[in-house]
From Swiss-Prot:
PANTHER family: DNA-DIRECTED RNA POLYMERASE (PTHR19376), DNA-DIRECTED RNA POLYMERASE SUBUNIT BETA (PTHR19376:SF54). It comes from Synechococcus sp. (strain CC9311). It catalyses: RNA(n) + a ribonucleoside 5'-triphosphate = RNA(n+1) + diphosphate. One of its GO terms (cellular component) is DNA-directed RNA polymerase complex. Gene3D superfamilies: 1.10.40.90, 2.40.40.20, RNA polymerase II, clamp domain (4.10.860.120), RNA polymerase Rpb1, domain 3 (1.10.274.100). It comes from the Bacteria. This is DNA-directed RNA polymerase subunit gamma. Binds 1 Mg(2+) ion per subunit. Binds 1 Zn(2+) ion per subunit. The lineage of its organism: Bacteria, Bacillati, Cyanobacteriota, Cyanophyceae, Synechococcales. The keyword Metal-binding applies.
Length: 634
């Protein structure tokens, strides 16, 4: 990017999540200071010094690794103020910079022994088990130091690659190997724990295995074929992302920035801390103890037990409770691990990233608005004035009603008539979006033209309810205001409720006449048994146009179910169409009248239709007139 002021979202096209290599993990946490010193490894479990209340060096809140806890001030206080920007204190080794770097600078813990990543081991499906083509139970036995696994069978005739051995079985085989009469020259190699798992994964030649699987799939069927395809899919994904299977075993653990796992002092002098700090502390303590045991060449059984405990500590850090006992803190509350923080409804993604609160939005209960058009919604004035406040202030200043923003805000608080008039001008033609959770399909959020209403409830047209799966028993809906002209245009063109009549899933209409509309349409067009059709010629019931019938009905001269003769030159479908008219009458000038059951036609001497009167009810005229007007309007 040439312009350094471009916003962050313009710096990339997409986000891709892949396995991190050990080098990448080190890269995240390791930094070289301007004085050439390499920092990043967290080696001490301490957090802060309880006397000075300053972070401990090389601990979980170390200022040398993560940056200063106060803006432009080093740990020892030698350098203060912004003029020392970028200097590394020669006494404490802390870089003088802003404290907000503690929100993104990471550290790492170099593990004394490899550990398996619990997501890939205990996830469903278990990718480690699929890749190694071994049962998950067997893989767990290896990782948690219950069984040995054969890494190289050597010359031993009873052993084979990836075979599991108990402690006793391996001791017997060792006795055979080292017996005086042993003929085994090439000794078998066995392993245990995540180190053995890492070796097995390193031995996998992905391209060769994928080729072999494709050949096997071609000649197999049923359950076996499905299993082979499952394994091939995982291997193909590893090949496509250039990831190595052994990266599922960790040599170093990233330590997330300290401001994302804070430690705060309470009123009584006590401290409240994030659970992650306790989990990291367990890992560091066990890792340091293991390193010390390896240094002093402690017995294998003690070292192995410490490795297992390190594995369990890392499991708890990544996903507490996934395997084994859940690690609990004070008052027996399970500690929140990294997985707990990011997964679920209250997790980082759904709560803070997808479901974050946004500006220019509101929320209220919905009520029915029967007088609204389908593309309209009733927006409470109190809500509208808040949502459109910047637009209203801008227009008030532009129209010289007020001189500055402060005066405009005072005027808005008083809710003067001038303000309401300006608000009406602002919202005219400015669509808003209504959303009802859960938004399960595209039609869960639609655009409407707002109409100012009194009260505090949003009014909604009853026909758009099926799309939102809404009813009026206390449901709430959120309002969002599109700001940019492009956003407003998109909302109007693509999201307006009247443009979303068909369901995107099935193609069937999702907006259909319902309840009182269906009943009203039926009542309007129904024939009353007690109302009998009238003969043609009754002047009080004969009209020259549909409009005349409507006017007579509006003047209460006729009722909805009265029969009328009305002049209508369009096509008519008779319910009981006869082959011949009931009567035919020819006049001296050559014109001809044909009387049918529900119509009377007049033809000239050439047989061309001059006029047509139809027998119908007032309700049907009203219905027909309404439909014609609606079609003409579009």
């Amino acid at each position: 990017m040439t312009n350094s002021n471009l916003r962050t979202e313009n710096h990339f096209d997409y986000v891709k999540i892949t396995l991190a290599s050990p080098d990448r993990v080190m890269e995240w946490g390791q930094r070289t200071l301007p004085n050439g010193q390499v920092v990043g490894e967290v080696t001490k479990p301490e957090t802060i010094n309880y006397r000075t209340l300053k972070p401990e060096m090389d601990g979980l809140f170390c200022e040398k690794i993560f940056g200063p806890s106060k803006d432009w001030e080093c740990h020892c206080g030698k350098y203060k103020r912004v003029r020392h920007r970028g200097i590394v204190c020669e006494r404490c080794g802390v870089e003088v910079t802003e404290s907000r770097v503690r929100r993104h600078r990471m550290g790492f813990i170099k593990l004394a022994a490899p550990v398996s990543h619990v997501w890939y081991l205990k996830g469903i499906p278990s990718y480690v088990a699929i890749l190694l083509d071994m049962p998950l139970r067997d893989v767990e036995q290896i990782v948690y130091f219950n069984c040995y696994v054969v890494l190289d069978a050597g010359d031993h005739k009873d052993l084979k690659y990836k075979q599991l051995l108990t402690e006793d079985e391996w001791l017997e085989i060792e006795d055979e190997i080292y017996a005086e009469d042993s003929e085994i020259e090439n000794e078998p190699v066995v392993g245990i724990g995540a180190e053995a798992l890492k070796q097995l994964l390193e031995d996998l030649q992905l391209n060769a295995v994928a080729e072999q699987l494709r050949e096997e799939i071609a000649g197999s069927k049923g359950q076996k074929r499905a299993k082979l395809i499952k394994r091939l899919r995982v291997i193909d994904n590893f090949i496509a992302t250039n990831a190595r299977p052994e990266w599922m075993v960790l040599d170093a653990i990233p330590v997330i920035p300290p401001d994302l796992r804070p430690m705060v002092q309470l009123d009584g002098g006590r401290f409240a801390t994030s659970d992650l700090n306790d989990l990291y502390r367990r890992v560091i303590n066990r890792n340091n103890r293991l390193a010390r045991l390896q240094e002093i060449l402690a017995p294998e059984i003690i070292v192995r037990n410490e490795k297992r405990m390190l594995q369990e500590a890392v499991d708890a850090l990544i996903d507490n409770g996934r395997r084994g006992r859940t690690v609990v803190g004070a008052n027996n509350r399970p500690l929140k691990s990294l997985s707990d923080i990011i997964e679920g409804k209250q997790g980082r993604f759904r709560q803070n990233l997808l479901g974050k609160r946004v500006d220019y939005s509101g929320r209220s209960v919905i009520v029915v608005g029967p007088k609204l058009k389908m593309h309209q919604c009733g927006l409470p004035k109190e809500m509208a004035i808040e949502l459109f406040q910047p637009f209203v202030i801008h227009r008030l200043i532009r129209q010289n009603i007020v001189n500055n923003i402060k005066a405009a805000k005072k005027l808005i608080q008083r809710a003067d008539d001038e303000v309401m008039q300006v608000l009406q001008e602002v919202i005219d033609g400015h669509p808003i979006m209504l959303n009802r959770a859960p938004t399960l399909h595209r039609l869960g959020i639609q655009a409407f033209e707002p109409k100012l209403v009194d009260g505090r409830a949003i009014q909604l047209h009853p026909l758009v309810c099926p799309a939102f799966n809404a009813d009026f028993d206390g449901d709430q809906m959120a309002v969002h205001v599109p700001l940019a002209i492009e956003a407003q245009t998109e909302a109007r063109m693509l999201m307006l409720a009247s443009n979303n009549i068909l369901s995107p899933a099935t193609g069937d209409p999702i907006i259909t006449p319902s309840q009182d509309m269906v009943l009203g349409s039926y009542y309007l067009t129904a024939l009353q048994p007690q109302m009998h059709p009238i003969e043609f010629g009754d002047r009080s019931r004969t009209y020259s146009s549909l409009e005349d019938v409507i006017h007579a009905f509006e003047d209460n001269r006729i009722t909805l179910h009265d029969w009328v003769w009305v002049r209508f030159n369009g096509e008519v479908e008779d319910e009981d169409e006869r082959e011949e008219p009931i009567t035919t009458e020819t006049l001296s000038d050559g014109t001809r009248f044909e009387q049918w059951t529900y119509r009377r036609d007049r033809f000239d001497e050439d047989g061309a239709l001059i006029s047509r009167y139809i027998l119908t009810t007032v309700g049907r005229v009203v219905m027909n007139h309404t439909i014609i007007d609606a079609v003409a309007a579009t």
